[in-house]
Amino acid sequence: MHTFAIVVHATSAIAAFIIGIVFIFQSNTLRQLQLGRAIVVLLMLMEVFLVIAILSHVTSLPTITQIIFGGLVILGGYMIWRAVQAVTVLTKQQQENQLKVIDHVGFVLISLFDGFAIVSALDLQAPGWLVAVIAVGAVGVGIFGINVRKKTLKMQTI
């Protein structure tokens, strides 16, 4: 059960990331709304299967790992909330709110990207300091990318 849950969790996260990238570069609001809803569903699947994966072996995990996984569950819930906020803003169809939508989806993308980077570093048995550097670096790269996209959108509306 644990392996299946991890596979579905990871597949949902990867799909949400890919759709999120497509979303960021989509200019059609209706298409963004459809993609946004898909992101919400995929994040919900990601979260449910994360919880299943954790619960399937929680008693064998060290306390610190249980705390970290608890934090990841909270982060996943917040990511879902941000994706729902993006969909809510899109349903109002006000062009001036486009930057808010990019902020919400951008947060989700940065969180997913950071998760991929951290898991990869951990799987490669990188030392803790390197995992921390990778995590901070991934956030920095993500913020830079989202800000570039927002600047492009601002220039298009002028």
List the predicted regions and their residue ranges.
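Alpha-helical membrane insertion/targeting regions
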Residues: M1-I158
